[in-house]
Design a protein with these regions (language model features):
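CBM-like, beta-strand-rich accessory domains located in the C-terminal region of large
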Residues: 1, 60-216
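Carbohydrate-active enzyme catalytic cores, enriched for enzymes
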Residues: 1-56, 60
Length: 216
């Protein structure tokens, strides 16, 4: 039996050892006046391997009243599940700022941090009102094998209607990627490291992305 030991800082769960740092956004949306710089990235995560970003969100464009500022707040620029290209929060323009009009709540969150096993599990209600869906995500890490396993689940009472969703994983600009012929795996090269990302249930696509962070 593993203990539930939240390693939480400012709404983020952060688990790390000397080689790997795994962090997940597991915080509810703050009140309106504190959302000037808020990004709708609930359950998004980042992975740092040996001091180098492997999985990285797109970053944040700080200048107000700019399309890139609005875009960088969207869920599509975060490593998370997006339904029908809609963000998990709705923004409204107030003066020159985009503030959250409809926020979300984290419904549950838990983490396990053992020497040979890590886990983060959380869910949010950002798609409940419009799509009657709760997004739940679980990420496991096995330090001895350097292996991550992730699960995304949409919990819906009414399953009669199909919904379109995408799960995006943004990679650091320093990575090199190659897709296997069966469209089920991506080979990732990060300096002197090699990683393999696989998905058995869906095809994987590679596309160009936007990176607003500082390139290493």
């Amino acid at each position: 039996k593993f203990k539930n030991d939240n390693q939480e800082l400012g709404g983020y769960i952060i688990l790390k050892n000397k080689k790997i740092c795994l962090s997940m956004d597991a915080g509810s949306t703050p009140s309106l006046k504190y959302t000037k710089d808020y990004q709708s990235g609930a359950l998004s995560f980042e992975i740092i391997s040996n001091g180098k970003k492997l999985i990285s969100n797109c970053g944040y464009y700080k200048k107000d009243n700019n399309k890139l500022n609005h875009l960088s707040k969207s869920s599509a620029t975060q490593n998370t599940l997006v339904i029908d290209d809609s963000s998990s929060c709705k923004f409204t323009k107030t003066h020159n700022n985009f503030l959250v009009k409809n926020g979300l709540k984290i419904l549950k969150k838990e983490s396990v941090f053992e020497k040979n096993y890590w886990k983060i599990n959380a869910s949010h209600d950002g798609y409940q009102k419009k799509y009657n869906s709760i997004h739940e995500r679980e990420i496991e890490f096995y330090p001895e094998q350097m292996k991550f396993i992730g699960y995304d689940k949409l919990v819906r009472k009414d399953t009669s209607k199909n919904i379109k969703f995408d799960i995006r994983f943004h990679l650091s600009p320093n990575t090199k990627v190659m897709k296997t012929q069966d469209n089920k795996s991506i080979l990732i090269e990060l300096d002197d490291e090699g990683w393999k990302f696989s998905c058995d249930n869906f095809d994987i696509n590679i596309d160009n992305g936007l990176y607003l962070g500082i390139k290493n």
